[in-house]
């Protein structure tokens, strides 16, 4: 009986030492991940030699499904991996951006797709000379499609100012923030194989600047069609630059025009307002666990 008592005491002392501790989960090495994102942005065989604009578009679109009335959608969950979001016509071509980032995800599995895609958007903007974007980690990846938003939530580029305002109001933006966010059209280009539209908005599609507003105000625009697709867009005089109908609506609507004129004259103001609006975009719908 005494032996049993002593044995129980010894086991009580040793049992914490004999228990296998849970595996140590280290946070993702964000600085290394940022460095690796930067290395994939420059590429010779795509567009103007940069993936930064399309990676910015990936971050934008994975956030822009948010609905403030239901608090659904947004970047949390990385739902663009699932049907129907992956098939939304507004997301055509984004497989290029996702594929470019996939090796980074495989090397650093601790980072969620949702964090990786949004972080890559921040890095892309800064890489192109844009403002510093505040980014916070903590997004999770959903394991199934139950929370995947329906299609049709992204802005349609052939619509009018009412559509723009309705879409951005759903996201929680006012007119100023809306015009600031659309200024991202200053980088990248349209691809007829993805959207049916073709061409670039500015002469510096790899440089983040206020040129979208400058070009929108100062060029002479005429409506035309993309021959291969029949899609209507606007061309400048020498047809080297384009605008979409939603872009033109920014100078037809008085409230939007007010901010277009301000940003065309004041790039630091645009950078400040864009940085704030984009950081807000990245946070839409995020629910972080607190300890």
Swiss-Prot record:
Q: Where is this site: Transition state stabilizer?
A: 57
Q: Does the keyword Heme apply?
A: yes
A single Gene Ontology MF term assigned here is: peroxidase activity
UniProt: heme b binding residues: 185
EC number per UniProt: 1.11.1.-
Which PROSITE patterns does the UniProt record give? PEROXIDASE_2, PEROXIDASE_4
Q: Ribosomal protein as a keyword?
A: no
User: Which terms are listed as keywords in the entry?
Assistant: Heme, Iron, Metal-binding, Oxidoreductase, Peroxidase
Q: Which family does it belong to?
A: Belongs to the peroxidase family. Cytochrome c peroxidase subfamily.
Q: What is this protein called?
A: Putative heme-binding peroxidase
Source species: Candida albicans (strain SC5314 / ATCC MYA-2876)
Q: Which gene encodes it?
A: CCP2
């Amino acid at each position: 009986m005494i032996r049993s008592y002593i044995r129980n005491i010894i086991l009580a002392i040793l049992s914490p030492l004999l228990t296998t501790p849970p595996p140590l989960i280290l946070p993702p090495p964000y600085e290394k991940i940022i460095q690796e994102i930067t290395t994939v942005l420059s590429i010779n065989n795509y567009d103007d030699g940069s993936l930064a604009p399309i990676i910015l578009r990936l971050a934008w679109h994975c956030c822009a499904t948010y609905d403030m009335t239901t608090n659904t959608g947004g970047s949390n969950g990385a739902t663009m991996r699932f049907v129907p979001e992956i098939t939304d016509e507004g997301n055509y071509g984004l497989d290029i951006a996702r594929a470019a980032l996939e090796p980074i995800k495989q090397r650093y599995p601790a980072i969620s797709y949702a964090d990786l895609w949004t972080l890559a958007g921040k890095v892309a903007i800064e890489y192109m000379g844009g403002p510093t974007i505040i980014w916070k980690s903590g997004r999770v990846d959903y394991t199934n499609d139950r929370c995947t938003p329906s299609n049709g939530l992204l802005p349609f580029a052939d619509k009018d100012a009412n559509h723009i305002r309705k879409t951005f109001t759903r996201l929680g933006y006012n007119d100023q923030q809306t015009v600031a966010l659309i200024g991202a059209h200053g980088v990248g280009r349209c691809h007829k194989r993805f959207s049916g539209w073709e061409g670039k908005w500015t002469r510096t599609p790899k440089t983040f600047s206020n040129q979208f507003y400058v070009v929108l105000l100062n060029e002479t625009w005429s409506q035309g069609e993309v021959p291969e697709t029949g899609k209507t867009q606007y061309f400048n005089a020498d047809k080297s630059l384009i605008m979409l109908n939603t872009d033109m609506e920014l100078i037809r609507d008085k409230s939007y025009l007010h901010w277009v004129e301000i940003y065309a004259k004041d790039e630091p103001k645009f950078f400040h307002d864009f940085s704030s609006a984009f950081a807000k975009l990245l946070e839409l719908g995020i629910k972080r666990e607190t300890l």
